[in-house]
Amino acid sequence: MTRINLTLVSELADQHLMAEYRELPRVFGAVRKHVANGKRVRDFKISPTFILGAGHVTFFYDKLEFLRKRQIELIAECLKRGFNIKDTTVQDISDIPQEFRGDYIPHEASIAISQARLDEKIAQRPTWYKYYGKAIYA
């Protein structure tokens, strides 16, 4: 599973922040593999709106600039929180065709969907999730 959230990185629980930091770069690798196999953006069914579940990762295939910028924010936030992260480099995506390197500005409704999913996860284990190392709900 690869998680890409739309919530501000500064508002993510520590666990969500680390998970996204680890998982987001997988999308760059997946797109590179598809490009190497001759795929173009038009070969994918990309939802016109943000979705969770099936199609969630594919939604971002033509939005790699958004993901690149988000990875910069994730790394900065991890360092700000004092996390010991090993990889602080942001992937150079200039080798990927331009049609995949679009930017994205999430709509408020999309951000709300993303936040609702995070809230749902936190509600399932309220004492486990932390923010700056402190329990969100003690």
Swiss-Prot record:
UniProt keywords, alphabetically: DNA damage, DNA repair, Endonuclease, Glycosidase, Hydrolase, Lyase, Multifunctional enzyme, Nuclease
GO MF: class I DNA-(apurinic or apyrimidinic site) endonuclease activity; deoxyribodipyrimidine endonucleosidase activity; DNA-(apurinic or apyrimidinic site) endonuclease activity; endonuclease activity; pyrimidine dimer DNA N-glycosylase activity
Effect of mutating R26Q: Almost complete loss of DNA glycosylase activity
Active site, UniProt feature: T2, E23
InterPro entries reported for this sequence: Pyr-dimer_DNA_glycosylase, Pyr-dimer_DNAGlyclase_EndonucV, T4_endonuc_V
Biological process per Gene Ontology, one example term: DNA repair
SUPFAM superfamilies listed in its UniProt record: T4 endonuclease V
Outcome of mutating R42Q: 25% decrease in DNA glycosylase activity
Site for Transition state stabilizer, residues: R26
Keyword GTP-binding: no
Enzyme Commission number(s) of this protein: 3.2.2.17, 4.2.99.18
Subunit structure: Monomer.
Function as written in the Swiss-Prot or TrEMBL entry: Participates in the repair of UV-damaged DNA by excising pyrimidine dimers that are the major UV-lesions. DNA glycosylase activity hydrolyzes the glycosylic bond of the 5' pyrimidine of the dimer. This leaves apurinic/apyrimidic (AP) sites in the DNA. These AP sites are removed by the AP lyase activity which cleaves the intrapyrimidine phosphodiester bond. Catalysis proceeds via a protonated imine covalent intermediate between the alpha-amino group of the N-terminal threonine residue and the C1' of the deoxyribose sugar of the 5' pyrimidine at the dimer site.
UniProt effect for mutating H16A: 30% decrease in enzymatic activity
Annotated phenotype, changing R32Q: 10% decrease in DNA glycosylase activity
Impact when changing H16C: 40% decrease in enzymatic activity
Reported effect, H16D: 60% decrease in enzymatic activity
Consequence recorded when altering Y132W: 10% decrease in DNA glycosylase activity
Annotated site, Substrate binding, chain positions: R3, R22, R117, K121
Domain of life according to the entry: Viruses
Phenotype for D119N: 5% decrease in DNA glycosylase activity
Effect of mutating E120Q: 10% decrease in DNA glycosylase activity
Name of the protein in its database record: Endonuclease V
Chain coiled-coil ranges: none
Effect of R68Q: 35% decrease in DNA glycosylase activity
Organism listed in the record: Enterobacteria phage T4
Catalytic activity: Cleaves the N-glycosidic bond between the 5'-pyrimidine residue in cyclobutadipyrimidine (in DNA) and the corresponding deoxy-D-ribose residue; 2'-deoxyribonucleotide-(2'-deoxyribose 5'-phosphate)-2'-deoxyribonucleotide-DNA = a 3'-end 2'-deoxyribonucleotide-(2,3-dehydro-2,3-deoxyribose 5'-phosphate)-DNA + a 5'-end 5'-phospho-2'-deoxyribonucleoside-DNA + H(+)
